[in-house]
């Protein structure tokens, strides 16, 4: 049996890190597509020349031709403009919807049997657009947001409590924006509720304030990176997050990862892509895990879904206009 094949659409910062991670983990042969002549070829050659040092054996190819993504097992899309300081993800919708339309047509023609992971912003709208244009089964077209948002939440908790990130369990639901829903009630350190640990450290009132600050920082974490970089947006952490999803599919790991999936009644949502916990395996999204939200969590989820609906509606008006 030959090696798996991963295609990366977009050769920018995230694409470069994705290619390197795929190679280092030997997930499969990698193709990087970008419209900029020479750029993907140069990046892939650079990574390939590190193979004797890093000790990986995979084929790396840069291209300007969608034909080269044929036979892909996984396609990861990062193409589109990144955010700049003062911009929201939603500000990118007009430009990036045009780019995504072209990308989706390429995937439809040459890689319609792949598992597709969208990273491009605004995420919830871009994954919706890609699925509509490709006509691919919804369980094989998803968005990467929740893995990253949850990772940020976990990191802030670990740093606050002075524990290993490996022992923190936490998750966000909803859209990839300022209305995402970090689930405080389920956050734990090796099974111990985070709120209990914060209350031991600070007392009940202060613990609530500290948790609220971490929740808000999680919601605004992407913008925090953008403000510091000044010329672009996060790329290391989004790439690592997408690789976790790709690896679960390529190796049939059946990991439970927060994934932007098309919902059909789950969590009371119909016909919209929203971040929820999903089992990712060889066939794509194999199952969405549902659980009861309390009144506060449900209200936050409803608000987040409303923001997603507004974004998708604005996408529809742009496409019609």
UniProtKB/Swiss-Prot annotation:
<dbReference type="Pfam" id="PF02866">
    <property type="entry name" value="Ldh_1_C"/>
</dbReference>
<keyword id="KW-0560">Oxidoreductase</keyword>
<comment type="similarity">
    <text>Belongs to the LDH/MDH superfamily. MDH type 3 family.</text>
</comment>
<dbReference type="Pfam" id="PF00056">
    <property type="entry name" value="Ldh_1_N"/>
</dbReference>
<dbReference type="InterPro" id="IPR015955">
    <property type="entry name" value="Lactate_DH/Glyco_Ohase_4_C"/>
</dbReference>
<dbReference type="InterPro" id="IPR001236">
    <property type="entry name" value="Lactate/malate_DH_N"/>
</dbReference>
<feature type="binding site">
    <location>
        <position position="121"/>
    </location>
    <ligand>
        <name>substrate</name>
    </ligand>
</feature>
<dbReference type="InterPro" id="IPR011275">
    <property type="entry name" value="Malate_DH_type3"/>
</dbReference>
<dbReference type="GO" id="GO:0030060">
    <property type="term" value="F:L-malate dehydrogenase (NAD+) activity"/>
</dbReference>
<feature type="active site" description="Proton acceptor">
    <location>
        <position position="176"/>
    </location>
</feature>
<keyword id="KW-0520">NAD</keyword>
<feature type="binding site">
    <location>
        <begin position="119"/>
        <end position="121"/>
    </location>
    <ligand>
        <name>NAD(+)</name>
    </ligand>
</feature>
<feature type="binding site">
    <location>
        <position position="96"/>
    </location>
    <ligand>
        <name>NAD(+)</name>
    </ligand>
</feature>
<dbReference type="InterPro" id="IPR001557">
    <property type="entry name" value="L-lactate/malate_DH"/>
</dbReference>
<dbReference type="GO" id="GO:0006099">
    <property type="term" value="P:tricarboxylic acid cycle"/>
</dbReference>
<feature type="binding site">
    <location>
        <position position="34"/>
    </location>
    <ligand>
        <name>NAD(+)</name>
    </ligand>
</feature>
<dbReference type="GO" id="GO:0006089">
    <property type="term" value="P:lactate metabolic process"/>
</dbReference>
<feature type="binding site">
    <location>
        <position position="83"/>
    </location>
    <ligand>
        <name>substrate</name>
    </ligand>
</feature>
<dbReference type="InterPro" id="IPR036291">
    <property type="entry name" value="NAD(P)-bd_dom_sf"/>
</dbReference>
<dbReference type="GO" id="GO:0004459">
    <property type="term" value="F:L-lactate dehydrogenase activity"/>
</dbReference>
<dbReference type="InterPro" id="IPR022383">
    <property type="entry name" value="Lactate/malate_DH_C"/>
</dbReference>
<feature type="binding site">
    <location>
        <position position="89"/>
    </location>
    <ligand>
        <name>substrate</name>
    </ligand>
</feature>
<feature type="binding site">
    <location>
        <begin position="10"/>
        <end position="15"/>
    </location>
    <ligand>
        <name>NAD(+)</name>
    </ligand>
</feature>
<protein>
    <recommendedName>
        <fullName>Malate dehydrogenase</fullName>
        <ecNumber>1.1.1.37</ecNumber>
    </recommendedName>
</protein>
<keyword id="KW-0816">Tricarboxylic acid cycle</keyword>
<feature type="binding site">
    <location>
        <position position="152"/>
    </location>
    <ligand>
        <name>substrate</name>
    </ligand>
</feature>
<comment type="function">
    <text>Catalyzes the reversible oxidation of malate to oxaloacetate.</text>
</comment>
């Amino acid at each position: 049996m030959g090696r798996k094949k991963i295609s990366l659409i977009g050769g920018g910062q995230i694409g470069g890190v994705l290619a390197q991670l795929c190679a280092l983990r030997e997930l499969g042969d990698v193709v990087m597509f970008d419209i900029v002549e020479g750029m993907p070829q140069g990046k892939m050659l650079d990574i390939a020349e590190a193979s004797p040092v890093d000790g990986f054996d995979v084929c790396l190819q840069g291209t300007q031709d969608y034909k080269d993504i044929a036979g892909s097992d996984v396609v990861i899309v990062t193409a589109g403009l990144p955010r700049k300081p003062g911009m929201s993800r939603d500000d990118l919708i007009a430009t990036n919807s045009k780019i995504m339309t072209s990308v989706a047509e390429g995937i439809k023609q040459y890689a319609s049997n792949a598992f597709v992971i969208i990273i491009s912003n605004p995420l919830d709208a871009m994954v919706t657009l890609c699925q509509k244009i490709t006509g691919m089964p919804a369980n094989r077209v998803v968005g990467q947001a929740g893995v990253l948002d949850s990772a940020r939440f976990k990191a802030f908790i670990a740093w606050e409590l002075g524990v290993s990130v490996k022992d923190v369990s936490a998750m966000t639901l909803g859209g990839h924006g300022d209305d995402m829903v970090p689930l405080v009630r389920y956050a734990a350190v090796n099974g111990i509720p985070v709120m209990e640990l914060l209350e031991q450290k600070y007392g009940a009132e202060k613990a609530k304030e500290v948790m609220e600050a971490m929740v808000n920082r999680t919601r605004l974490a992407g913008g925090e990176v953008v403000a510091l970089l000044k010329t672009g947006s996060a790329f290391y952490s989004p790439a690592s997050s997408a690789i976790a999803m790709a690896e679960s599919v390529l190796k049939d790991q059946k990991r439970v990862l927060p994934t932007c999936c098309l919902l059909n009644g789950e969590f009371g949502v119909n016909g919209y892509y929203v971040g929820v916990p999903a089992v990712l395996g060889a066939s794509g999204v194999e199952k969405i895990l549902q659980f009861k939200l309390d009144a506060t969590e449900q209200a936050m989820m409803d608000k987040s879904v409303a923001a997603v609906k507004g974004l998708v509606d604005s996408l529809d008006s742009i496409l019609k206009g």
